[in-house]
Design a protein with these regions (language model features):
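Short, basic, low-complexity termini and linkers enriched in Ser/Thr/Gly/Pro
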Residues: 5-20
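Membrane-embedded beta-strand positions in outer-membrane beta-barrel channels/transporters
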Residues: 30, 100-102, 146, 298-302, ...
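Acidic, low-complexity, intrinsically disordered peripheral segments
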Residues: 30, 223, 400-422
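Bacterial Sec-pathway N-terminal export signals of envelope proteins
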Residues: 20-66, 181-183, 219-261, 270, ...
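Periplasmic alpha-helical coiled-coil/stalk elements that build and connect Gram-negative outer-membrane
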Residues: 52, 134-249, 348, 352, ...
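Transmembrane beta-barrel architecture of outer-membrane proteins
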Residues: 96-98, 144, 189, 272, ...
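Small/polar (Gly/Ser/Thr/Ala-rich) solvent-exposed segments
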Residues: 41, 64-83, 90-93, 104-133, ...
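Amphipathic alpha-helical coiled-coil segments
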Residues: 42-57, 134, 138-157, 175, ...
């Protein structure tokens, strides 16, 4: 019994916790959508690839060891034909054997490995930034879903107000019908309109559920139908917004990477130095006059400087300069388009603020007209249709206000998103 009581208490607490769920904020929706977007997995893959590549490049300074062997038969060999008294020089066999081990150690590579490692790091940064650009685009989708739900919530509140007015009208007309001063058809008109309002609620709830379901997919969390969304704080945009979009960092990284390619070209055309050791076993050895198997080795310093790259160095750098100019053009186009969008949003904000101010005045007037119609309905001066017309007129005025308020909030959020501050 005690155990059963504990289970019941825990279940009750679970129900209370679920019902007291905190409203979902727009920023939290952003974060959850980005964390659960499949593309986010590419971040770790880029890090792993970069780590492996840089590690491989670092091994370029490790000793390079190779083994080789050969057995040959020559049609002719070097021999000493001049007779020397008291000395007999044997001829070298035509079949010869050689097994070699070569060890090469790079001492100076002109900075190639360093440049390649820097390039690889910049390439990883560029790929990561491409991911950030794609993730940022998610915000536009989340904005649409989030504000769509808020818009539907406001519409449902307005329908509830209409239902209140209709119920008040129904009570008055019912009293009139009971007293024989109104026709029942007037009552039926209001009841039919009340049923239409209930249908409107069903439509709005269904649309809201659809948006919540899609939002659940994006954030990878099962949101209940009655999930509350926190209305974002309206932020007035500045006169000159500083653009902080991830695309700008991408362009900057691309320029750094092209600059790294300049360094790599210079490094490839510098001299290289290293030490080497070659050891072997063969017949003959280094002493060609000794016709037998022997161990031998050779060691020393090697300097290599190839001038072939100097022929193409100038054109290779010009190609990079063209690429840098292309990136600059892409950046200019992006900034132009972004600033154009910001100007459009500012114009939209100004228009909506004026419309909202006008909506308030219209609603005040419509309320006065509706209240007067309510009194006239109660006194039997007008019919239910006349009263219903004024109720619908106020409803339309409030719907316009709701639409403009949500559009204003959307324009403010869009402004922040476009500028990169959201």
């Amino acid at each position: 019994m005690k155990r059963l009581l504990t289970i019941i208490i825990n279940c009750s607490l679970l129900i209370i916790n679920s019902s007291a769920q905190e409203p979902l904020s727009l920023q939290r929706a952003y974060d959850m959508a980005q964390q659960n977007y499949p593309l986010i997995k590419q971040r770790d893959l880029i890090k792993q690839t970069t780590g492996y590549t840089v590690d491989n490049l670092s091994k370029g300074f490790l000793p390079q060891i190779s083994f080789s062997g050969q057995a040959t038969y020559q049609s002719e060999v070097t021999g000493v034909k001049i007779p020397i008294p008291g000395i007999s020089i044997a001829s070298v066999n035509k079949d010869q054997y050689k097994f070699l081990t070569d060890i090469n150690q790079t001492v100076y590579d002109g900075g190639i490995i360093k440049s390649q490692k820097e390039l690889q790091s910049l390439n990883a940064e560029m790929e990561q930034q491409k991911v950030e650009v794609e993730l940022y685009k998610l915000k536009e989708r989340i904005n649409q879903l989030f504000l769509g739900v808020l818009f539907l919530d406001e519409q449902m509140k307005q329908v509830d107000l209409v239902k209140t007015d209709l119920n008040n009208g129904i009570k008055r007309v019912e009293a009139q019908v009971d007293n024989g001063v109104a026709f029942k058809s007037n009552l039926n008109v209001l009841k039919a309109e009340l049923l239409k309002a209930d249908q409107r609620i069903i439509e709005l709830e269904s649309s809201r559920k659809g948006l919540i379901d899609v939002l659940s997919l994006f954030i990878n969390q099962n949101l209940p139908e009655n999930t509350k969304l926190e209305t974002p704080q309206a932020i007035a945009p500045g006169i000159a917004a500083e653009i902080q979009r991830p695309e700008l960092k991408l362009y900057s990284t691309q320029q750094k990477m092209l600059g790294g390619q300049f360094k790599l070209i210079d490094s490839r055309n510098k001299p290289k130095a290293g030490i080497f050791l070659q050891g072997g076993y063969g017949k003959p050895g280094l002493n060609l006059l000794k016709n037998e198997f022997a161990f031998f080795y050779t060691t020393g310093v090697r300097l290599n400087w190839s001038f072939g790259g100097l022929y193409t160095q100038k054109n290779e750098k010009k190609i990079i300069e063209v690429s840098q100019k292309t990136v600059d053009i892409q950046k200019e186009v992006f900034l132009l388009n972004t600033n154009t969008q910001l100007k459009q949003q500012l114009s939209e904000l100004d228009k909506l603020q004026k419309l909202i101010a006008s909506d308030g005045e219209i609603i005040d007037l419509r309320i006065k007209v509706k209240d007067a119609a309510k009194a006239q309905l109660e006194n039997g001066v007008i019919t239910a249709n006349d009263y219903l017309r004024e109720v619908n007129a106020e409803d339309q005025a409030r719907q316009s206000l709701i639409t403009h308020q949500v559009q204003l909030l959307q324009a403010q959020i869009n402004y922040q998103t476009i500028s990169g501050k959201q």
